Amino acid sequence: MFIVSDGTGITAETFSHSILAQFEMRFRKVRMPFVDTPEKAHIAVGKINEAFHNEGVPPIVFTTLVNQEANKALRRAKAMILDMFQTFIEPLEKELGLKSTHAIGRFHQNADTEAYKNRIEAINFSLAHDDGQSHKNLEEADVILVGVSRSGKTPTSLYLAMQYGLKAANYPLIPDDFERGRLPSALYAFKPKIFGLSIDPQRLTEIRNERRPGSKYAALENCRYEVNEAEAMMRREGIKWLSSTHKSIEEIATTILQEIKVDRDNY
């Protein structure tokens, strides 16, 4: 499977993941970004045809080429071509009565926009407020994730920052919090922004044993205790939460956005 783009290829790759995930089959992926001239397209065709001759089956090619000459050249490849622009842009041009700009990399040319700056600020905020490192400026947070250690708070926080420009802090619930039976006092003022993550104890012990094998921290009995205490605390405090055990980061983030009613998209 080839991903051919005149830009970074992020759009085509994301689309290909969504489509191919519907098939229980593994694909060998070849990325070919910045194919923005007919000459580069000819080189791409050569590599695609080589794969065809070596493997005996036409490769699948996901493409987002704006340059019409490059597009024509690519279509000489012995492959199944899935052209996102032709599939979606041409019908839209007809429906809207407008011609598209056909600008290369238009979707990602946002380095000077306010949205891009917001995303960078959000990433910096999430890094500074990872794992309870700082309680400073929590009023700026769009969401504050809580949960036991290794329940998925950090990757979810960073995904929310990078994908949606959300300032996401996260705080680990620890034995001291369980003994008190309540959230840390620093978080109470921001309770409407808090969302909890939990995880199956068996899965948690597997993850923790990769980090600290044989420790009390990773023991199944301790993981059960922490998860039970954290879930009980979130129920008492009226905090919405979900189990991250069988959910992707994308699914977790989407649920959080729905539950805390954040309407912001800086992607």
Curated annotation (Swiss-Prot):
Annotated positions binding ADP: 147-154
Superkingdom assignment: Bacteria
Record-given protein name: Putative phosphoenolpyruvate synthase regulatory protein
Keywords: Kinase, Nucleotide-binding, Serine/threonine-protein kinase, Transferase
Its biological purpose: Bifunctional serine/threonine kinase and phosphorylase involved in the regulation of the phosphoenolpyruvate synthase (PEPS) by catalyzing its phosphorylation/dephosphorylation.
Catalytic activity: [pyruvate, water dikinase] + ADP = [pyruvate, water dikinase]-phosphate + AMP + H(+); [pyruvate, water dikinase]-phosphate + phosphate + H(+) = [pyruvate, water dikinase] + diphosphate
UniProt GO molecular function: ADP binding; ATP binding; phosphotransferase activity, phosphate group as acceptor; protein serine/threonine kinase activity
Family: Belongs to the pyruvate, phosphate/water dikinase regulatory protein family. PSRP subfamily.
Record has Transmembrane as a keyword: no
Taxonomic lineage: Bacteria, Pseudomonadati, Pseudomonadota, Betaproteobacteria, Burkholderiales
E.C. code: 2.7.11.33, 2.7.4.28
